[in-house]
């Protein structure tokens, strides 16, 4: 994972081939606790649910994720409520996973408990 933390997300407006299943599983080993999911269109996502003591902690976490996403120029889908936040990451422009998704996941995992 350390090598992912040193990297920065690269702008992607398409033209890049999404990771195949073997690449996805190789990179998944570098980010702890992230599940590989698919949506109804068969697009792969990295998904992780975080739990917190209350709503305010969930909200603080989401705000930090938002700051990281802006710095990286790569934006996850986030849902949150009382005591939880779920983060889903994909590279929308290519309708699949790329190294950017794993870089962002690794950086999100570095957020200290709020």
Listing of model-derived features with the role each one plays in the protein:
Residues 1-56, 60-114:
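Long, contiguous binding/interaction regions
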